[in-house]
């Protein structure tokens, strides 16, 4: 009979197979009431599943913000299915998984759902959840599951069974009163746990993500353990909507996208100014950290991509073209090109480390449904670098990369950075000795800099361990940007060698390094982080000179010209409009400084300075203001005096 070991080491003996809920009941009614599911020997199970042998058990409760919340959200997806089938009996249910901060359900319904319909569906979900009905799990044979869904006309569930479930498996069917769904689970024991949810929006999604399949309707929702957490999340979503880079990009005339070039960015003058400033900043860092900048071809013969191994792994994501009976691929990444540059001319150990960087224009054929403004595109620019070094140089080079990452991120104001180290997978290339040495070098580099990190066992690429840097923005959203990836494979495949101290030919270790990742995506992140209020050094327009009447027009024009000659992005607004109108317009455009020229300022050779947040900085002599703004730009100061 089972002996159950709890997390505190205590044991409970039972005469018969016992469920997680029954164990909780044996401890106390309060725990039983809060029990959502269990974790038996590390595997999640439903609260009703019987434990037949000795096992360790963790009880998942409403206090669990990871597994407990994920289970509640998954059960809310089933609740959504229950409500949908009551309101739209002809709807065919596809899949309803959890995602970050929520869940969705894909449905096949002839009627296009509106926001009004969404409110009706949510109201029905509330009615159902209030009854706190029991969720009943039944393990059935494959055939019984298929017969169940065939009788209900659920063709998508039948397809999942046919293609993804073994015939000898026993699928779990979850009964929500008259509604039945299929899932691996676990799920909540009753709907009393699903009281704090919100349906968010509707989008289109191809079945199985394949554009050759039917377009389904995807309903997104979110759920939390309590009302306070739900409301806080909804408030963050409202703020995120205000900061949406697509909306602000249009408002500030930064860029646009159009149907004739899906996933490709049309940079306008203002947006391109931001892009170029980022390039200048990264180039400054490249010089500081000893990189040489190179430029590889946009397109290379298929033969090279086959030799590198990318053709086998990335062919579907590569754009191709043919000419003179040769097939070419537009590069999805820069690394094979950088090895071609390294291979030109004999290299000695004295030439290493060799740090090669490129603002590489890359293209990947991302699914149309995944494209999102400039955050997820098909054409993008990588601030990519590859370091060729010896095994003994790994740690010093990794340390330098990490310093560069932190130097860069702190310049933009990102302080909350989560670091993950991925170690060797089961299937890999390279000796255990080089893996030992490399993993230890990464660990030592992080420890030497007092950087906390999480080890992801077995999550490294087959060709080397990796460090990932994830930024958390002002809305606590995670953005994985920087990587430091060791590679023992590609230099071998593409014939990269150097002459060692003993005159032997050796293969260099290659370190892939990205700081921003994609410049397009990083600009999108910055737009939303700053809500369009770029720091002065990045702002497309750094100052605007406005006159009060036509009398000061020439003076305002002269002021703007002098600012421009001093390298400041400035212009004069000499329109015959009221001063209040002009100030409001440029405030909405997030111009850092507005320089007002009236009669007094013109006579004294001064300007009246105010910030975009409405702060009056008083009057400045023009040269004094130029010195002030130049110092702010040169220091890449984050915040204005506002």
UniProtKB/Swiss-Prot annotation:
Family as reported in the entry's similarity comment: Belongs to the class-II aminoacyl-tRNA synthetase family.
Molecular function terms from GO: ATP binding; metal ion binding; threonine-tRNA ligase activity; tRNA binding
Keyword terms of this UniProt record: Aminoacyl-tRNA synthetase, ATP-binding, Cytoplasm, Ligase, Metal-binding, Nucleotide-binding, Protein biosynthesis, RNA-binding, tRNA-binding, Zinc
Designated gene of the protein: thrS
Chain segments carrying region Catalytic: 244-535
Protein localization: Cytoplasm
Subunit (UniProt): Homodimer.
Any single biological process term in GO: threonyl-tRNA aminoacylation
Catalytic activity: tRNA(Thr) + L-threonine + ATP = L-threonyl-tRNA(Thr) + AMP + diphosphate + H(+)
Protein name: Threonine--tRNA ligase
Co-factor remark: Binds 1 zinc ion per subunit.
Cofactor(s) annotated in UniProt: Zn(2+)
E.C. code: 6.1.1.3
Domain of life where this protein originates: Bacteria
InterPro entries to which the protein is assigned, alphabetical: aa-tRNA-synt_IIb, aa-tRNA-synth_II, aa-tRNA-synth_II/BPL/LPL, Anticodon-bd, Anticodon-bd_dom_sf, Beta-grasp_dom_sf, TGS, TGS-like
A GO CC term attached to the entry: cytosol
Lineage of the organism: Bacteria, Pseudomonadati, Pseudomonadota, Gammaproteobacteria, Vibrionales
Coiled-coil ranges from the UniProt annotation: none
Functional note: Catalyzes the attachment of threonine to tRNA(Thr) in a two-step reaction: L-threonine is first activated by ATP to form Thr-AMP and then transferred to the acceptor end of tRNA(Thr). Also edits incorrectly charged L-seryl-tRNA(Thr).
Binding-site list for Zn(2+): 335, 386, 512
Stretches assigned to the TGS domain: 1-61
